[in-house]
Amino acid sequence: MLFRSTQVMEYIEKIDAALSELHRVLRPAGRAVIVDTDWDSIVWHTRDRGRMNRVLTAWEEHAADPFLPRTLADRLTRAGFEVETQEIVPLFNPTFDENTYSNRLIDLIVTFVTDRFGIDSDEAGSWADDLRSAGARGHYFFSLNRYLFIANKRH
């Protein structure tokens, strides 16, 4: 039996209980394939580092654990799994394009951070405009790390 999860576990409040339940319901020799993001790894080229830091700090609240990959292998082991694989899966957009992950993420972040941590709609909009105008000038850069874990249920 195979369990697949992409960008889900970081949103679960009681992750240890969820991993224990996953271990319980998997058949013997079952496998879990989990991909989650460490949101501290996000990098955008910007002219205003202070604003970028404020926006990304507010964005961290969108997940129950925005840094889950740092502890996920240990949590899987404690839940009874044997961790077979840990790999990095980078997302990299060195140029701006409307069809990229990073462009879609800009709008998600603007919606989420507006009216949090003192960020109003004008500041959030200026943040987004700065990134997109960097793209128009040929100065765009985006990188984000996701992490892949493959864990097996011990016999």
Model-derived features with residue positions:
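Core SAM-dependent methyltransferase catalytic element
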Residues: 79-82, 144-155
